[in-house]
Amino acid sequence: MTVRVRLAPSPTGNLHIGTARTAVFNWLYARHRGGKFILRIEDTDRERSRPEYTENILEGLQWLGLTWDEGPYFQSDRLDLYRQAIQTLLDKGLAYYCYCTPEELEALRAEQKAKGQAPRYDNRHRHLTPEEQAAFEAAGRTPVIRFKIEDDRQIEWQDLVRGRVSWQGADLGGDMVIARAAPRGEIGYPLYNLVVVVDDIAMGITDVIRGEDHIGNTPKQILLYEALGATPPNFAHTPLILNSTGQKLSKRDGVTSISDFRAMGYLAPALANYMTLLGWSPPEGVGELFTLDLAAKHFSFERINKAGARFDWDKLNWLNRQYIQQLEPEEFLAELIPLWQGAGYAFDEERDRPWLFDLAQLLQPGLNTLREAIDQGAVFFIPSVTFDSEAMAQLGQPQSATILAYLLEHLPAEPALTVAMGQQLIQQAAKAAGVKKGATMRTLRAALTGAVHGPDLMAAWQILHQRGWDEPRLAAALKQAQTTS
């Protein structure tokens, strides 16, 4: 049998990292088994579903490299199929019309709460007579449709992640609403548990891989599979992604959508790699840096943890840093140019390309995210700098003015500054000031960049020298040094 899995996001928001991680596990399992990965958009929430969210979901999956084999299918196009299934359940006597009002149901919940009982529907309209139904209709009530759940029914399945799972029918909240209110003889808008099962049957889904927050839906869905004459698929409920405090990661935690991570400068392969590690342990010898294709070769449910996976920003940044360092120089520059343009930095992409290339190579080793190149690169796109407190302190050292005066006087006029020339100037300036080379380099860095920490000093000096910006910066720093020393 060909393995068929599906991702079924709701377009009520941008692609969430939890949904994306579910997509990763589905994709890995499908590729591992030579199966099919199906994309289905669950857009039955008419009030909250938006086309722009659908577009965001599709773009996010494609950016991550999670290509699908079928779809996207849209549930809003399949309403007739769901209504046929509901009619089948009505005809079999497995579903019925319920005329309870919202006020009656709220009163029932309040009564149960007062008694310390779990809220559940008491199935009071399961056996209405035709006369009782007619009376409710005459009173202007429109019924929902409920699916019968027997309290004494035990539902079990062998979860591919969690092992044997068992639920009692009495714990499922009573008979389940499967269609919204509509006049009798009509079938209202179908609801989640019903449409999911109908689609999974129609699409031949063999394995349902989803987050553990869906585990309470599974027994209800198993009953629906059986009622519709279908064999339930395999189920795998993966651990939730947790925040730093051990709670489920949510929008309140800030960055949670794939488009947010992308905007922050995380690379798609790095993010996909990290999401794979959120709950899955690679076998020995694979390491923590791997492609999706490599992970697919080794993927198994046995290596998925049952406990929640805590989101670790340091780990993500470390992974992203490795992937940034692996980028080819031209590929890396292509990533940075749009960011620099978006930041408003002035340059001519064609004329300045060699200079931009050198700048990109200077920054590449020190970046955790691509977006850090905006701040770290800023000092190279402006003719002058502002000295931070540490730079001011360095320029205030007794010999800084002597160092800067020597460098200014002997600065080469030609546009090319070689490493040898720069090193010689630093050594000579140190000798003239009677200080060590390290102190001279700290003073030079403070003058050129406005800070005492940063990327390779010689490469930074060469880049600034190409634009002729080292001379005015040295002059400004000398003036500052003479004022404070």
Curated annotation (Swiss-Prot):
GO biological process: glutamyl-tRNA aminoacylation
Enzyme class: ligase
Chain location of the short sequence motif 'HIGH' region per the record: 9-19
PROSITE patterns cross-referenced by the UniProt entry: AA_TRNA_LIGASE_I
Tagged with keyword Cytoplasm: yes
Reactions it catalyzes: tRNA(Glu) + L-glutamate + ATP = L-glutamyl-tRNA(Glu) + AMP + diphosphate
Keywords noted in UniProt: Aminoacyl-tRNA synthetase, ATP-binding, Cytoplasm, Ligase, Nucleotide-binding, Protein biosynthesis
Coiled-coil region: none
Locus of motif 'KMSKS' region: 248-252
GO CC terms in record: cytosol
Record: residues binding ATP: K251
Record GO terms (molecular function): ATP binding; glutamate-tRNA ligase activity; tRNA binding; zinc ion binding
Location(s) in or outside the cell: Cytoplasm
CDD domains recorded: GluRS_core
Residues the record lists as binding L-glutamate: R6, Y192, R210, G211, E212, D213, H214
InterPro entries: aa-tRNA-synth_I_cd-bd (IPR045462), aa-tRNA-synth_I_codon-bd_sub2 (IPR020751), aa-tRNA-synth_I_CS (IPR001412), aa_tRNA-synth_I_cd-bd_sf (IPR008925), Glu-tRNA-ligase_bac/mito (IPR004527), Glu-tRNA-synth_I_codon-bd_sub1 (IPR020752), Glu/Gln-tRNA-synth (IPR000924), Glu/Gln-tRNA-synth_Ib_cat-dom (IPR020058)
EC number: 6.1.1.17
Note on how the cofactor is bound: Does not require zinc.
Listed HAMAP family: Glu_tRNA_synth_type1 (MF_00022)
Function: Non-discriminating glutamyl-tRNA synthetase. Catalyzes the attachment of glutamate to tRNA(Glu) in a two-step reaction: glutamate is first activated by ATP to form Glu-AMP and then transferred to the acceptor end of tRNA(Glu). Acylates both tRNA(Glu) and tRNA(Gln) with glutamate, but has 13-fold higher efficiency with tRNA(Glu).
Subunit structure: Monomer.
Further facts: This organism lacks a tRNA synthetase for tRNA(Gln). Instead, tRNA(Gln) is first charged with Glu, and then the bound glutamate is converted to glutamine by GatCAB.
NCBIfam families: gltX_bact (TIGR00464), PRK05710.1-4 (NF004315)
Family classification: Belongs to the class-I aminoacyl-tRNA synthetase family. Glutamate--tRNA ligase type 1 subfamily.
Protein name: Glutamate--tRNA ligase
Organism: Thermosynechococcus vestitus (strain NIES-2133 / IAM M-273 / BP-1)
Gene name tied to this protein: gltX
